[in-house]
Amino acid sequence: MDKLSRPEIRQQTTQQMYDVPENILEIDVINPQTHGIGRNMFTTYEIVCRTNMPYFRLHNSSVRRRYSEFEKFHDMLERESGRVSIPPLPGKIFTQRFRDDVIEERRQGLENFLRLVAGHPLIQTHSRVLSSFLQSPEFKPTP
């Protein structure tokens, strides 16, 4: 009978166990707010980003985005990331889109989308639009 070899176990120091991880990127989509009246109503979502990664200008940021800006961001990511499959956004909603449960479902979908794309190593290091979308108060999509 052959003995299976076990990998070597390295002991960690207390400093290593409690030190700040090398790369942190935390993204939350919170606090949806509906604006406007009648046909001009829309909802914005607050994107809170906490990171220590060098590709981001700020360590802590908070910006507001509408769904249409997420769509433009998605399109820009697809154009610049030919080798990476960009996950879909939550679907467009045509009826009852301002109900609390519908807004919450979309918020969760947008948060999952951002966490997926921002967690991809190639997008983190090579995207020209990721940090701008997550951190710039005036996100200006290119046509």
UniProtKB/Swiss-Prot annotation:
| Compartment list | Cytoplasm; Golgi apparatus membrane; Prevacuolar compartment membrane
Molecular function (GO) terms listed? Answer: phosphatidylinositol-3-phosphate binding
The intrachain disulfides are none
Alphabetical list of Pfam families matching this protein: PX
Residue stretches in coiled coil: none
**CDD domains in the record, alphabetically?**
PX_Grd19 (cd07295)
PROSITE patterns hit by this protein: PX
Please state every residue range assigned to the domain named PX: 23-140
Which InterPro entries has this protein been placed in?
Answer: PX_dom (IPR001683), PX_dom_sf (IPR036871), PX_Grd19_PX (IPR042138), Sorting_Nexin (IPR051074)
Q: Which domain of life is it from?
A: Eukaryota
Q: What residues does a 1,2-diacyl-sn-glycero-3-phospho-(1D-myo-inositol-3-phosphate) bind to?
A: R66, S68, K92, R97, R106
Q: Name one GO biological process term.
A: endocytic recycling
Q: Which PANTHER family match?
A: RE52028P
According to the UniProt entry, the note on domains is: The PX domain binds phosphatidylinositol 3-phosphate which is necessary for peripheral membrane localization.
Q: Which family does it belong to?
A: Belongs to the sorting nexin family.
Record's function text: Required for retention of late Golgi membrane proteins. Component of the retrieval machinery that functions by direct interaction with the cytosolic tails of certain TGN membrane proteins during the sorting/budding process at the prevacuolar compartment. Binds phosphatidylinositol 3-phosphate (PtdIns(P3)).
Name by which UniProt lists this protein: Sorting nexin-3
- This protein's species is Schizosaccharomyces pombe (strain 972 / ATCC 24843) (Fission yeast)
